[in-house]
Amino acid sequence: MTTNYIFVTGGVVSSLGKGIAAASLAAILEARGLNVTIMKLDPYINVDPGTMSPIQHGEVFVTEDGAETDLDLGHYERYIRTKMSRRNNFTTGRIYSDVLRKERRGDYLGATVQVIPHITNAIKERILEGGEGHDVVLVEVGGTVGDIESLPFLEAIRQMAVEVGREHTLYMHLTLVPYLAAAGEVKTKPTQHSVKELLSIGIQPDVLICRSDRAVPANERAKIALFCNVPEKAVISLKDVDSIYKIPGLLKSQGLDDYICKRFSLNAPEANLAEWEQVIYEEANPGGEVTIGMVGKYVELPDAYKSVIEALKHGGLKNRLTVNIKLIDSQDVETRGVEVLKGLDAILIPGGFGYRGVEGKVMTARYARENNIPYLGICLGMQVALMEFARNVVGMENANSTEFVPDCKYPVVALITEWRDEDGNVEVRTEESDLGGTMRVGGQQCHLTDNSLVRQMYGEPTIVERHRHRYEVNNMLLKQIEAAGLLVAGRSADNKLVEIIELPNHPWFVACQFHPEFTSTPRDGHPLFAGFVKAAGEYQKRQVK
């Protein structure tokens, strides 16, 4: 089987939406019956985004096989059925790390190690490895054409056309076509200059995706085609839309998938986008709305919680409810009190690291528990719920996590020192272990407790969910906590680690150590988020009565 490659680049400005555009195109090609995957090449020098600040970089998306990756991989999984893996994302730092390791080992036999050919060869090897077994691979190159950091990646994808054949490679370039109100027209010159920059590197784009706040007129698309040496039918207008789920249909309506299939000589049936049309219908025709408060520490950048926000919206789709998300800084709860939580239909505390704002989260969990407000805790959100319950119900004064207070009297949350990874191998960690690459991360099996709320929501006894954490419930203190009324609703496959807790005497209080947001999609939703949003709607109705 021959694999075809679509290389996606961006020009003029950053944040044009390359990831969404690539994922939307992949969704159409998948709907035509093709085996599709997507890769993201990141030009930064960090080995992976695992230790990068969420406020700078956004969330870290975790794959099934335990890779800590760019948030764009979350977009990919929400648009196509193919599961991403560590092969779908790599950085400049990872490439240089691999090449330097080989140099130290003597693999290059004393040769002078250079960007060309050694770095570019390493990039190409990873692209080819990631593309194995697929009909079409979309490769998104991070950054903007013209950035110094991107040059080795652009050179590598230029060489790919020579090595795998021009008939199996296609260059798709996203560019900005701004509208100038004073002139009353869109301007194509930035696009022309961006393509000129690509040409100077040796890449002639085959498709231009023109981003604008309005549809780019046919005469302007013809002008772009003429000056950029691209067929007119390959100049696609991608205007701003009120829902990102409309983008696959928008691209299909302009024949982009037909053009690509003809270019690659792929005999594929017409795309059926009925599932996406259903998503659009559900989003446009809600039966009501709920307000959910998300209490975290990175709220100044919503992308830090991208998958959680999307998963809440998916939960809304499954319940025909519009979900309004109110982002609340947990430090505001500490300074202003629980007044900032008034008027919410449900409360969610997502994952996080570090002590800042933790006490505000503990106060939030108590407020939700005592006022019968639906509560969903994720990762740290489960740990603070446990701390709160231990303090205020069990009577363990100042119960805490050893992450925050190493010598606390009641360490209800402690460092995991040993567990099994996704392959069944034993992993061991200590307080001295590096921060990068040392967490319990990736898909882990969980056995659900019979007659629990989560068992009812999932509809099956065993699930697999993705983790990213170092600390877990301390089993030494668990019996006392369970005796006070807390239910352990899910445990790890070896029965050693607590994965889910519930409060049976509360209308809807669920907290999990894993990250369910990473497996939620607009077409399928996720049982926990669907149940959580449903509970928010029911709470709202009770308040009205």
Curated annotation (Swiss-Prot):
This is CTP synthase. Homotetramer. Residues 291-542 form the Glutamine amidotransferase type-1 domain. It comes from Serratia proteamaculans (strain 568). GO terms for cellular component: cytosol. InterPro entries: Class_I_gatase-like, CTP_synthase, CTP_synthase_N, GATASE, GATase1_CTP_Synthase, P-loop_NTPase. GO terms for molecular function: ATP binding; CTP synthase activity; glutaminase activity; identical protein binding; metal ion binding. CTPSs have evolved a hybrid strategy for distinguishing between UTP and CTP. The overlapping regions of the product feedback inhibitory and substrate sites recognize a common feature in both compounds, the triphosphate moiety. To differentiate isosteric substrate and product pyrimidine rings, an additional pocket far from the expected kinase/ligase catalytic site, specifically recognizes the cytosine and ribose portions of the product inhibitor. Pathway: Pyrimidine metabolism; CTP biosynthesis via de novo pathway; CTP from UDP: step 2/2.
